[in-house]
Curated annotation (Swiss-Prot):
UniProt KW keywords: Electron transport, Membrane, Mitochondrion, NAD, Respiratory chain, Translocase, Transmembrane, Transmembrane helix, Transport, Ubiquinone
Protein name: NADH-ubiquinone oxidoreductase chain 4
One cellular-component annotation, GO: mitochondrial membrane
Membrane-spanning residues: 4-24, 28-48, 53-73, 87-107, 109-129, 141-161, 173-193, 212-232, 245-265, 272-294, 306-326, 330-350, 373-393
EC number(s) on file: 7.1.1.2
Gene (UniProt): ND4
GO BP term, example: electron transport coupled proton transport
Similarity comment: Belongs to the complex I subunit 4 family.
Protein role: Core subunit of the mitochondrial membrane respiratory chain NADH dehydrogenase (Complex I) that is believed to belong to the minimal assembly required for catalysis. Complex I functions in the transfer of electrons from NADH to the respiratory chain. The immediate electron acceptor for the enzyme is believed to be ubiquinone.
Subcellular location(s) of the protein: Mitochondrion membrane
Broadest EC class assigned to this enzyme: translocase
InterPro entries: NADH4_N, NADH_UbQ_OxRdtase, ND/Mrp_TM
Membrane topology, record value: Multi-pass membrane protein
């Protein structure tokens, strides 16, 4: 594990070079391909070295982090062309990648907590440094307060786990039985806010709307998945309590997902719509993890990977339109098929992947999550029907409203898009649909 970490760390001095943008980009791509072929054990921890090691769950999420960070650099080439501190931007992306790499590969719960929290700092830098509106300061405050206040109780829980077991080394931890209810709440509350669960989701649309494209991609692609990964790890310690209390979180998130789907119908801001749809998808992931069965955990992994790639691609599409027309409003970005006909196919492909139509990885994830939630309680089937149906409705609403109809009369001319943009969208769509063909990787 350390060899990959050191390769990322030694990319940082390259940022001091005058023209490092595409060099760092190519080297992270190379690293992701080397890392891809390195896993040799599906079920056990492998590549263990000095409190770092991966199992299959963290391996897939590290791979997703490397992939999304490459695509962030590709998508943000307007920073490179305008020479708005491109070297510092690459440095922040590398710093964020190091934090994410260490979070997903930490075998000590305390070091996981430290890296989990410190991944907020580079994200805040991205929002404050390269965001668009002055309101980005408020979005940054929302982001910090929601996530930091929610995760302080988790620190107390880690100290008490250390008291009980005299270690925080993950493979040595066991379930400590029926402790008390607050212990359970504090353990998972930080991760539920990060996901985010309904009622604590207000920071997410705010952060997305104010963030640059790179910030939106990393938020939707990886940082929400940190919450799911944290719940998966903590379930080992609180599974006995989970049997008693999981029904409450599961019901809240599923009911919240349906309400958020209704909120999506009311959105006219493209970014805001995609951000709210992330909350609806993550509610399914929370439910899968809370059922604590094999279908649920593996389904939530495949939906996290699928959603990370597809929503990142949708944010790229909204940014392409924003850079061309200077607006994210659906009232102005309508009838785009008349102006950018070849971009419409990418809108369709990524929208269909986002609503879990075949052959995307989201379909595998949603099937297994439906399986696990209905096996947990057959009464949930009504809410699941609503959630699946409405997710298709608001995605099709976004696609048809933005692509079809008359174009806005104030738009006189529009570029068809650059090769870089089509290449970027292909690199989102291709792994998303390729992984569906190898679904057995997720259900070993």
């Amino acid at each position: 594990m350390l060899k990959y970490l050191f390769m990322i760390i030694f990319l940082i001095p390259i940022c001091l070079l005058g023209n490092c943008w595409w060099l760092v980009h190519s080297l992270i791509f190379l690293l992701s391909f080397i890392f891809m072929i390195s896993l040799y054990s599906y079920s056990d921890l492998s590549m263990i070295s000095y409190y770092f090691g991966v199992d299959f769950y963290s391996f897939m999420l590290i791979l997703l982090s490397l992939w999304i960070c490459c695509l962030m650099i590709t998508a943000s080439s307007s920073i490179y062309s305008s020479s708005y501190h491109p070297n510092f931007f690459v440095f922040v992306v590398l710093l964020l990648l190091i934090m994410l790499f260490c979070s997903f590969s930490s075998l000590n719960l305390f070091s996981f907590y430290i890296f989990f929290e410190s991944s907020l700092v580079p994200t805040l830098f991205l929002i404050l440094g390269w965001g668009y509106q002055p309101e980005r300061l408020q979005a940054g405050v929302y982001l910090m307060f929601y996530t930091l206040v929610a995760s302080l109780p988790l620190l107390l829980v880690l100290f008490s786990i250390n008291d009980l077991f005299n270690t925080l080394y993950y493979p040595l931890l066991i379930d400590f039985g029926s402790f008390y209810f607050l212990f359970y709440v504090f353990s998972i509350f930080a991760f539920l806010v990060k996901m985010p669960i309904f009622l604590f989701h207000l920071w997410l649309p705010k952060a997305h709307v104010e963030a640059p494209i790179s910030g939106s991609m990393i938020l939707a692609g990886i940082l929400l998945k940190l919450g799911g990964y944290g719940i998966f790890r903590m379930m080992k310690v609180i599974s006995c309590l989970g049997l008693s209390f999981n029904y409450f979180v599961l019901s809240l998130s599923l009911f919240g997902g349906v309400i958020i789907s209704f909120v999506c119908f009311r959105q006219v801001d493209l970014k805001s719509l995609i951000a709210y749809s992330s909350v609806a998808h993550m509610s399914l992931v929370i439910c899968g993890l809370m059922t604590m069965n094999w279908w649920g955990c593996m389904g939530s992994l495949s939906l996290m990977i699928g959603h990370g790639i597809s929503s990142s691609g949708l944010f790229c599409l909204s940014n392409i339109i924003y850079e061309l027309l200077g607006s994210r409003s659906l009232l102005i970005n309508k009838g785009m098929i008349n102006l950018m006909p070849s971009m419409t196919i990418w809108w369709f492909l990524l929208s269909s992947s986002n609503m879990a139509s075949p052959p995307s990885l989201n379909l595998l994830g949603e099937f297994s999550l439906l399986n696990s939630i209905i096996s947990w309680s057959s009464y949930m089937i009504l809410l699941l029907i609503f959630l699946s149906f409405f997710s298709a409705v608001y995605t099709l609403y976004m696609y048809s409203y933005s692509q079809h109809g008359l174009y806005y009369s104030g738009v006189y001319t529009c570029s068809l898009g650059y090769f870089r943009e089509y290449h970027l969208l292909f690199l989102h769509w291709f792994p998303l649909n390729l992984l569906c063909l190898k679904g057995e990787y997720f259900y070993f």
